[in-house]
C-alpha cells in the first residue's frame, strides 16, 4: 500500500507522528510535525545551507554567506536572521540571485553599510564596538537575470553605497511600480504602472535595462548539475583576495594610565 496515503490533506496542519527504529509499538515515541505540500521549500533551504557550507569550507570559516530571496517581508527576515548569525565573519557574500523584489530595500543597505565608530574596552573582557550590530569587512553581491524590481534596486543601491563588487549576470530591469489595485466584483483586481525609477541625473537608468555586474560570470546548467556554481566561486575568490590584501584590523589592548601617581 501507499505509505503516504495517510498524509493526504494534512499539508500545513500539525499532526502527531509515532516513530520507532523498528515496525512495532513497543519503544516508539510521538513527535509533532507539520507536513509540507511539496519538496520545494526543503530543497530551497538545502541549497542555501549547502552554499553556506561551501563558502565556510573554502575560506576556513572567514567568509559568511547570506541569501536574500526578496525585498519583501521574507527577504527582510532572512537577511537579518543570517546577518546576525554571521556578524563575526571577516567578509560576507550577499546572494540576491532570483530575488523577486517587494519593497524598496533602502533599509537593507542601511544594515549592511553601518560604519564603525569606536571600540569599548573592559578589563578581562573582549572589546566590543559601536554600532553593536554591524559588519565592517569586505562584501560582494551575487546577481542574475531573475533578480527584478526590488531585486534590481538592491544591487543598484549596494553599488552606489560602495559596499562592494557585483558578480553574475545583468539583472532584469523592472522598476516601474504599482500603487493601489481596484477590486472587481469577481474577486480579481486591476493594476496599472503608476511610478518608475529615475537616476539622480533624471535618466531612466536601470529601468528596462537592469544592473550590470562588475564581473560577468555565466552559470551553465551542466556545471550547476555537478554542483559547480561559477558565480559563487568567483565571489569566494574575490573575498579571499580582499582579506589577503587588506586583513581585518583591531585595536591593541588599552594601556591604562597609572592614576596612583
Outline where the language-model segments fall.
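Flexible glycine/proline-enriched surface loops and loop-helix/loop-strand junctions
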Residues: 216-222
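Conserved functional hotspot residues or short segments at active or partner-binding sites
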Residues: 207, 222-226, 230, 237-261
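Short intrinsically disordered coil segments
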Residues: 47-51, 81-83, 207-212, 251-254
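Metal-dependent DNA phosphodiester-chemistry modules and their immediately adjacent helices/loops
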Residues: 53-54, 147-149, 184-216
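Short, intrinsically disordered/low-complexity patches at protein termini
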Residues: 117, 128-129, 190, 214-216, ...
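Cleft-lining beta-strand/loop regions that shape enzyme active-site pockets
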Residues: 1-185, 224-228, 237-245
Amino acid at each position: 500500500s501507499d505509505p503516504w496515503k495517510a498524509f493526504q490533506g494534512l499539508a500545513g496542519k500539525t499532526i502527531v507522528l509515532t516513530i520507532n527504529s523498528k515496525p512495532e509499538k513497543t519503544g516508539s515515541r510521538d513527535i509533532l510535525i507539520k507536513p509540507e505540500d511539496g519538496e520545494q521549500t526543503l530543497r530551497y533551504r538545502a541549497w542555501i545551507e549547502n552554499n553556506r557550507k561551501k563558502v565556510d569550507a573554502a575560506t576556513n570559516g572567514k567568509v559568511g554567506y547570506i541569501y536574500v530571496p526578496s525585498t519583501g517581508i521574507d527577504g527582510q527576515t532572512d537577511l537579518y536572521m543570517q546577518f546576525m548569525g554571521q556578524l563575526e565573519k571577516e567578509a560576507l557574500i550577499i546572494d540576491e540571485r532570483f530575488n523577486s523584489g517587494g519593497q524598496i530595500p533602502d533599509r537593507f543597505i542601511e544594515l549592511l553599510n553601518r560604519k564603525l565608530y569606536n571600540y569599548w574596552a573592559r578589563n578581562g573582557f573582549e572589546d566590543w564596538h559601536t554600532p553593536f550590530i554591524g559588519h565592517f569587512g569586505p562584501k560582494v553581491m551575487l546577481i542574475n537575470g531573475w533578480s527584478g524590481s526590488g531585486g534590481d534596486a538592491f544591487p543598484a543601491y549596494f553599488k552606489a553605497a560602495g559596499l562592494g563588487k557585483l558578480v553574475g549576470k545583468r539583472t532584469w530591469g523592472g522598476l516601474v511600480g504599482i500603487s493601489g489595485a481596484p477590486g472587481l466584483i469577481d474577486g480579481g483586481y486591476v493594476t496599472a504602472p503608476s511610478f518608475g525609477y529615475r537616476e539622480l541625473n533624471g535618466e531612466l537608468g536601470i529601468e528596462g535595462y537592469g544592473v550590470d555586474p562588475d564581473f560577468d560570470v555565466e552559470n551553465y546548467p551542466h556545471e550547476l548539475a555537478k554542483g559547480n556554481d561559477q558565480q559563487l566561486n568567483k565571489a569566494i575568490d574575490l573575498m579571499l583576495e580582499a582579506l589577503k590584501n587588506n586583513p581585518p584590523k583591531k585595536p591593541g589592548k588599552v594601556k591604562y594610565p597609572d592614576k596612583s601617581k
